Amino acid sequence: MAWHSQTWTFFQGEWHEGNPGIMGPRTHAAWLGSSVFDGGRVFDGLMPDIDRHAARVNRSAETLGLNPTMTAEAIIALAREGVKKFSPGTAIYVKPMYWGEADGPSTIMADPDSTQFCLCLFEAAMPPAMGGLSVTKGLYRRPSLETMPTDSKAGCLYPNNARI
């Protein structure tokens, strides 16, 4: 799959087509990793568990010390609105995200009141049904709660997983 497919992003009260710039070089999340996301799917006209994904992104934001700016219900309503921008039958990935924009009391902490939100929806085909699955053990392990915010869907966790 190409890294960029049909995409709609809700940011600062408006829908933007494509991949809009939403962070700058001073954005806390861009250099210190204060970002969270969640990911739901739309397929076959269904949007299963979107309520759980919306609630979890808010919990993840709080875990990272960010102040969520949207209710789960508002995220769900925006997702339903955004899905209408795609052709019927399109498989869509639904990705609500929060991040710290400004430094907080210390440079390494984000200012909770600077929390930004966007909802990104993009075309993403469902993977083909598989006949089986292979697993292996890698050299790296997932960090544990005393070293990383593993009780959240924090963006800072995923580069380590990609090394496996």
Write out the residue ranges for each language-model feature.
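Short, acidic/charged, Gly/Pro-enriched secondary-structure junctions
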Residues: I76-G104
